[in-house]
UniProtKB/Swiss-Prot annotation:
Pathway in which the depicted protein is active: tRNA modification; 5-methoxycarbonylmethyl-2-thiouridine-tRNA biosynthesis
PTM annotation, UniProt: C-terminal thiocarboxylation occurs in 2 steps, it is first acyl-adenylated (-COAMP) via the hesA/moeB/thiF part of UBA4, then thiocarboxylated (-COSH) via the rhodanese domain of UBA4.
Organism expressing this protein natively: Kluyveromyces lactis (strain ATCC 8585 / CBS 2359 / DSM 70799 / NBRC 1267 / NRRL Y-1140 / WM37) (Yeast)
Subcellular location: Cytoplasm
Residues modified as 1-thioglycine: G101
Family indicated by similarity: Belongs to the URM1 family.
One Pfam family here: Urm1
InterPro entries with a match to the protein in the record: Beta-grasp_dom_sf (IPR012675), Mopterin_synth/thiamin_S_b (IPR016155), Urm1 (IPR015221)
Gene3D superfamilies documented for this protein: 3.10.20.30
UniProt superkingdom: Eukaryota
BP GO annotations: protein urmylation; tRNA thio-modification; tRNA wobble uridine modification
UniProt crosslink position (Glycyl lysine isopeptide (Gly-Lys) (interchain with K-? in acceptor proteins)): G101
UniProt protein name: Ubiquitin-related modifier 1
Keywords from the named record: Cytoplasm, Isopeptide bond, tRNA processing, Ubl conjugation pathway
């Protein structure tokens, strides 16, 4: 199990029960280490309310282009993207950069 904070910013909160921040314990059967890829699937399974909203968040089984993903305020590309192994206290932020204006 890992305890993390997940943030949905830039309007993404509308697909996750209109809540911008979650403090969650993520536990997956048979896994000692939980990576960001596991967390993304956990979000789809547990936080996204409507199946149709999954495509707002994901494209081709990864975070949709236009969503900035940070792990502890560092671009996830520098941290290994979906392979980054989460640790207690990590903050994972998803920020949509695509919005009207």
């Amino acid at each position: 199990m890992v305890r993390v904070i997940i943030e949905f910013l830039g309007g993404l909160d509308v697909i996750v029960k209109k809540q911008r921040q979650y403090k969650v314990d993520v536990q997956l059967d048979g896994k000692d280490e939980i990576n960001v890829g596991d967390l993304i699937q956990w979000i789809v399974d547990n936080l996204i309310e409507h199946e149709g909203d999954v495509n707002v968040f994901l494209e081709n089984d990864s975070i949709r282009p236009g969503i900035l993903t940070l792990i502890n305020d560092t671009d996830w590309e520098l941290e290994g993207e979906k392979e980054y192994v989460l640790e207690d206290g990590d903050v994972v932020s998803f920020t949509s950069t695509l919005h009207g204006g």
